[in-house]
Design a protein with these regions (language model features):
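N-terminal, active-site-proximal structural segment of metallo-dependent hydrolase catalytic domains
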Residues: 1-69
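Short, intrinsically disordered, charge-balanced linker/junction segments flanking boundaries
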Residues: 72-73
Length: 73
């Protein structure tokens, strides 16, 4: 059975400072949907997710007031 996780991170950089990556590893999720990432992939080290075995698909917000989403598979 696949484990699908959805999580509103309210800022991916802030979540990573709070050990989001360690928590994510403990979930052993197959697919992770992240909301409100509030960053572009160039603004943080994506290897934190690729090192966990995920392929990353980012759709950062282009307009002010929007936050963007990401999917990790």
């Amino acid at each position: 059975m696949s484990v699908i996780l959805t999580y509103n991170v309210n800022g991916i950089r802030a979540a990573l400072r709070k050990d989001f990556d360690k928590w994510l590893k403990s979930t052993n999720a197959d697919i992770v949907c992240l909301q409100e990432i509030k960053a572009n992939p160039q603004q943080f080290d994506e290897s934190v997710f690729t090192d966990l075995g995920y392929h990353c698909y980012w759709n950062p917000a282009e307009n002010k007031g929007y936050s963007g989403v990401a999917i990790l598979t």
